[in-house]
């Protein structure tokens, strides 16, 4: 076997290993997003209408404010990944129905962004509030922001004597908690 053939084989092997790593990274961010998406949607649906105006103290964002914030942030972030950042105006909405509709619209935009990400394009540049960033970085940024927001929303749910969705599922084979 000549050196050229060996170098070509090594190059092909390295390329396929790189693609597997990229595919794993893309699968991980999609899986992570789907988990927090479920938590946020279930939390927004669980909180009763009168809980949407609940704040734990002066100067705090209301529960509905958190839902609106997630919707607007996702519309901007995932819209940027999709090539058209948007503002839904959800921060000004107050009714549960309007906020849930905006939240679902923002998740549709994010579904498109996450599903459109592949091992081939995950490093491509997309527009974000930081300027041009790699697509995968914007997706992980969106996921991380969603996690932070869900953490705050879960506290509001507990303050209303309800059980956050992620905790409720712990007694159903996920985690070690008892859930309700």
Go through each PLM region and give its residues:
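Cleaved targeting-peptide boundary
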Residues: 20-27
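Short, contiguous alpha-helical
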Residues: 30-34, 38-41, 49-89, 128-180
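Well-ordered alpha-helical scaffold segments within catalytic/enzyme domains
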Residues: 39, 43-44, 78, 109-114
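Acidic/histidine-rich alpha-helical segments that form the ligand environment
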Residues: 94-128, 133-150
């Amino acid at each position: 076997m000549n050196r050229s053939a060996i170098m070509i084989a090594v190059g092909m092997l390295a390329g396929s290993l790189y693609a597997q790593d990229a595919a794993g990274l893309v699968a991980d961010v999609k899986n992570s997003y789907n988990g927090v998406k479920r938590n946020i949607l279930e939390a927004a649906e669980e909180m009763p209408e009168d809980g949407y105006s609940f704040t734990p103290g002066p100067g705090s964002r209301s529960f509905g404010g958190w839902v609106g914030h997630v919707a607007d942030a996702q519309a901007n972030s995932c819209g940027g990944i999709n090539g058209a950042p948007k503002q839904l105006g959800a921060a000004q909405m107050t009714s549960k129905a309007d906020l849930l509709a905006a939240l679902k619209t923002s998740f549709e935009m994010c579904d498109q962004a996450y599903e459109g990400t592949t091992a081939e394009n995950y490093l491509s540049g997309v527009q974000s509030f930081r300027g041009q960033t790699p697509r995968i970085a914007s997706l992980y940024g969106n996921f991380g922001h969603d996690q932070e927001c869900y953490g705050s929303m879960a506290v509001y749910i507990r303050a209303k004597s309800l059980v956050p969705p992620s905790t409720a599922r712990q007694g159903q084979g996920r985690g070690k908690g008892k859930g309700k």
